[in-house]
UniProtKB/Swiss-Prot annotation:
The active site is at residues 138, 159, 177, 243. Residues 264-269 are annotated as: Important for the catalytic mechanism of dephosphorylation. It comes from Streptococcus agalactiae serotype V (strain ATCC BAA-611 / 2603 V/R). The keyword ATP-binding applies. This is HPr kinase/phosphorylase. Pfam families: Hpr_kinase_C (PF07475), Hpr_kinase_N (PF02603). ATP binds at residues 153-160. PANTHER family: HPR KINASE_PHOSPHORYLASE, PROTEIN YJDM-RELATED. GO terms for molecular function: ATP binding; magnesium ion binding; phosphorelay sensor kinase activity; protein serine/threonine kinase activity; protein serine/threonine/tyrosine kinase activity. Belongs to the HPrK/P family. It is an enzyme of class 2 (transferase). One of its GO terms (biological process) is regulation of carbohydrate metabolic process. CDD domains: HprK_C. Keywords: ATP-binding, Carbohydrate metabolism, Kinase, Magnesium, Metal-binding, Multifunctional enzyme, Nucleotide-binding, Serine/threonine-protein kinase, Transferase.
Amino acid sequence: MAVTVQMLVDRLKLNVIYGDEHLLSKRITTADISRPGLEMTGYFDYYAPERLQLVGMKEWSYLMAMTGHNRYQVLREMFQKETPAIVVARDLEIPEEMYEAAKDTGIAILQSKAPTSRLSGEVSWYLDSCLAERTSVHGVLMDIYGMGVLIQGDSGIGKSETGLELVKRGHRLVADDRVDVYAKDEETLWGEPAEILRHLLEIRGVGIIDIMSLYGASAVKDSSQVQLAIYLENFETGKVFDRLGNGNEEIELSGVKVPRIRIPVKTGRNVSVVIEAAAMNHRAKQMGFDATQTFEDRLTHLISQNEVNDD
């Protein structure tokens, strides 16, 4: 997926100083950003023209110390046909030579009042999200108490119905049926809906319902980190399920491992409440509060006491 410069401008509210006509035609194909420091000195051996060029205070100060002729020569060599745009931070003044180089090469000049480091982080975050490789998985992604929970299971098990019940209980729907997941880094997985399914939920016997229209903006979310996976499966006599919570089952999506809990489903069981409890318990474990460990410690202490009493 490529990101147009127009998409970047709209998302980060950047000011377009020059090149409105190039915003849709210029595409950003890499999440890497270039801070052209050495390039300002004329060293272009490892220059990556396909990257978005970000000019901060240091680059700007060095640029402004040059003569007009040298300034134009450097900028003209920086601005190549592969270059999507140049972004100037801190609302720094745009030199005339930058306008000339941009006009000669068809490069857009963008400006932001944000400090360079913050702007760099925002641009990188957005580009990483847009350009990361997506994997589609079947399930329902919910935001439960601020935690992204991916609900999976066999077809007809009641995933969407459970999602609807969770929405009624005050939680937020991220995606139903098809969840597009991508890795932000080696340990962070994010999920979002397919655009055609955004805010929609399918309930057998009812059809497709618009959660945004029925329950309001507070009931939906555009994307969420995936921190826990729940797998719903039919209860079968004799089938072993984790009763202590000390299982370490995981699934791997887009190269990121996510802890998974299997929950048996049978008539009369309030699955949405169980999922709420599972999400809260997982968060408690992340904070260092482990009920299973507490139980095991108490059991060990009780056994030790009984052994002393027997002696």
